[in-house]
Curated annotation (Swiss-Prot):
It comes from the Eukaryota. A ubiquinone binds at H201. The keyword Coiled coil does not apply. The gene is MT-CYB. This is Cytochrome b. Heme b b566 binds at H97, H196. The chain crosses the membrane at residues 33-53, 77-98, 113-133, 178-198, 226-246, 288-308, 320-340, 347-367.
């Protein structure tokens, strides 16, 4: 008699994805982030579901309902802060996952990579709309500023913004629809993640060397299940340290002031995980140009397979490319810092230089370094 996990129609799918899956024997901890993202997504959906049971998406009661969750609901405060800080952990894993893909050349799996980029956009949209829901000052003004960017689109811009708002300003209709979208998108993300995994399992995982590992595979369970559990425990520990000791460390104090359309906060800024893109947006003195740069800063990932000029897949044996990659990481950290600073000298010029460097590194310097490395192989 065959094992039930290999014969049952549903169990068979799970078995082939998580138990008997042949995996490369040399994948490092950088390969943990895929499973961690899955765990965070489930955690965010669960905490979000419990928050939605008590939240009201009405401009008059939204702020109070969040206060009610924190004060009156059993363990409401921990659910709320796990959800808010869980988003930060989600983005840390997401950026590391994308960085891993860039470093080790995983973008050569075209379908997997492209769905990954769509997933990144979907998660960013979800996080943005979630930030609007508590209806504090930063929620309201963040929603106003970011949705207003669409008015830069020629001809249809203004109509588009008013259509998204459901009126002539960010108001009750906007909050209600943002709640609806914030609720449905994580389920769409979960479905996309399954498609992402489906395409990955068509080719099998990449590995640090970038060389085919077909000759040396090991079963996913128990080797990588135990490794993933360790990674998950470490990150859950980090999350709980954040939630229990410094729950507001990454938040904005302005969001503890109820939304007021008549009073603009001195510095409007998004959550830390959007600051790099926000810095790129602000560094261009033209509205449409800024919006295009903002979209392209993420959409540029789609071009990664086209910009790959090296004869080697991974950066493991390419010192010049490695150097440029870490300069890119430092550049993104600089942009993140600039995004949180006021628009004044010297931050403006630093932001502009960092923005130029960002696009220059990806579009020009890294492909050039790859070609130089190709020629060095002939020596």
């Amino acid at each position: 008699m065959t094992n039930i996990r290999k014969s049952h129609p549903l169990m068979k799918i799970l078995n082939n994805a998580f138990i008997d899956l042949p995996a490369p024997s040399n994948i490092s901890s950088w390969w943990n982030f895929g499973s961690l993202l899955g765990i965070w997504l489930i955690l965010q959906i669960l905490t979000g579901l419990f928050l939605a049971m008590h939240y009201t998406s009405d401009t008059t009661t939204a702020f109070s309902s969040v206060a009610h969750i924190c004060r009156d609901v059993n363990y409401g405060w921990i659910i709320r802060y796990m959800h808010a800080n869980g988003a930060s952990m989600f983005f840390i894993c997401l950026y590391m996952h994308v960085g891993r893909g860039m470093y080790y050349g995983s973008y050569t799996f075209l379908e997997t990579w492209n769905i990954g980029v769509i997933l990144l956009f979907a998660v960013m949209a979800t996080a943005f709309m979630g930030y609007v829901l508590p209806w504090g000052q930063m929620s309201f003004w963040g929603a106003t500023v970011i949705t207003n960017l669409l008015s830069a689109i020629p001809y249809i811009g203004t109509s588009l913004v008013e259509w998204i708002w459901g009126g002539f300003s960010v108001d009750k209709a906007t909050l209600t629809r943002f709640f609806a979208f914030h609720f449905i998108l994580p389920f769409i993300i979960a479905a996309l993640a399954m498609v992402h995994l489906l395409f990955l399992h068509e080719t099998g995982s990449n590995n640090p060397t970038g060389i085919s590992s077909d000759t040396d595979k090991i079963p996913f369970h128990p080797y990588y299940t135990i490794k993933d559990i360790l990674g998950a425990l470490l990150l859950i520990l980090a999350l709980m340290l954040l939630v229990l000791f410094a729950p507001d460390l990454l938040g904005d104090p302005d969001n503890y002031t109820p939304a007021n359309p008549l009073n603009t906060p001195p510095h409007i800024k998004p959550e830390w995980y959007f600051l790099f893109a926000y810095a790129i947006l602000r560094s261009i003195p033209n509205k449409l140009g800024g919006v295009l740069a903002l979209v392209l800063s993420i959409l540029i990932l789609i071009l990664m397979p086209l910009l790959h000029t090296s004869k080697q897949r991974s950066m493991m044996f390419r010192p010049f490319s490695q150097c440029l990659f870490w300069i890119l990481v430092a550049n993104l950290l600089t942009l993140t810092w600039i995004g949180g600073q006021p628009v004044e000298h010297p931050y403006i010029i630093i932001g502009q230089l960092a923005s130029i460097t960002y696009f220059l590194l990806i579009l020009v310097l890294m492909p050039t370094a790859s070609m130089i490395e190709n020629n060095l192989l002939k020596w």
